[in-house]
UniProtKB/Swiss-Prot annotation:
Pfam annotation, one family: Orn_DAP_Arg_deC
Catalytic residues as annotated in Swiss-Prot or TrEMBL: 365
Protein known as: Decarboxylase flvG
Domain of life: Eukaryota
Site (Stacks against the aromatic ring of pyridoxal phosphate and stabilizes reaction intermediates): 210
Subunit architecture: Homodimer. Only the dimer is catalytically active, as the active sites are constructed of residues from both monomers.
GO molecular function terms listed in the Swiss-Prot or TrEMBL record: ornithine decarboxylase activity
Record function comment: Decarboxylase; part of the gene cluster that mediates the biosynthesis of flavunoidine, an alkaloidal terpenoid with a tetracyclic cage-like core connected to dimethylcadaverine via a C-N bond and acylated with 5,5-dimethyl-L-pipecolate. The tetracyclic core is synthesized by the terpene cyclase flvE and the cytochrome P450 monooxygenase flvD.
PROSITE patterns: ODR_DC_2_2 (PS00879)
Catalyzed chemical reaction(s): N(6),N(6)-dimethyl-L-lysine + H(+) = N,N-dimethyl-cadaverine + CO2
The species this protein was found in: Aspergillus flavus (strain ATCC 200026 / FGSC A1120 / IAM 13836 / NRRL 3357 / JCM 12722 / SRRC 167)
Amino acid sequence: MPYATEETSSVAWFPEGNLCHSKTCGPRTNGIVLEAMKGKLSQPSEWDRSEPFCVMDLGYVYNEYQRWTSLLPDVKPFYAVKCNPDTHIIKVLNAMNSGFDCASRNEMELVMSQGVAPERIIFANPCKKISDLEYAQQSGVRKMTFDNEAELQKIRQRFPDAQLILRCLASDPSATYSLGSKFGASSATSVKLLQCAKSWGLSVVGVSFHIGSNAKDPTAFDKAIQNSREVFDAGLRTGHDMHLLDIGGGFSAHNFDAMASSIRQCIGKYFCGIDVEIVAEPGRYFAAGALTLACGIIGRRDAAANDEDKENRHMLYLNDGVYGTFICNIFEPGPQPKVLRASGDFYPLDSEDEYERYTIWGPTCDGTDCVAESVALPKSLAIDDWLYFPEMGAYSTCLSTGFNGFHSDRETIYMSSDPAADIYL
């Protein structure tokens, strides 16, 4: 692929911003992603220009794994497949000996179809379907989480030789998506569950927690890891062979240096001298920055100068929306869009074009299908121009629906900003 070469790192039309927030990535990531989009739009009639498309940089995934092992060398990542089940991501991480966090039979089947051994899978769903539990037993996926007695009973009946990981209650109030109200046993409940498991002859091998997705407070790990040590010791006293600590997910590439520093300190503080295997379940950390989404402008609406609605004077309508790739925009602001002209040219930095504020809508007939409000973009934007959105790889394409008859599939162009990952194209 021409845009997956070293030469593209020197292109002169980089727009402002960098799609890669990893310290191990450079301008080449920016260049080849933009080259891929430009090349796509320059194709006259080989594809349906009415549909959005994506560009995935596998070099980003590769480099973020290197960054992880540099900052947290004693914590093995188990990629959260739910975040983005793209097989290319799975292939890269599998080749780097990553583990995988799966929540269902389908996810386990997917990663094992890519050559992942069952020993490198954690069935990290505290409340599992019986059929999925039976599939795990048949496939040899022994490590799994639980947080209640009913789940223990289910496992006792169908997979008594499983290696159990007790999910403890933890929370970061600053996280975008909290999980504490749905999963996690309190300290008192954890002790009772350890005793129950022992009396039933079940083997608890470790403790896990999840402070929430897209966590922002590095200090939230201190209390969670301290509590994990207390439950870990309770398991040892009960007679379990405790040897695993799972610190969950929620990591963002943006603040990972601070997060990693806090985690290293907490592990040294609470698990110093303990023979323990430490794992984590990062998802968006690997996937978010790997994907850029390009959307076409299919409509523009401008109110009359005397219109009383000052807030919605200028509107753009895209061929993707919150029922598609932008579903997370319902819960948090999405990335700032950048401009790609219908000709395939990027909007120049030195443009003297006037800007105005737009409301950006998705293509459906639902009034809540709003991608963004009050976004400053060039006044000259027109139908058939394109906007592109960086960092769209997490919880986006995998959640896309076919509501209103719009396609849920997104064509994806694969490339690599690092030659070491070119073999996965």
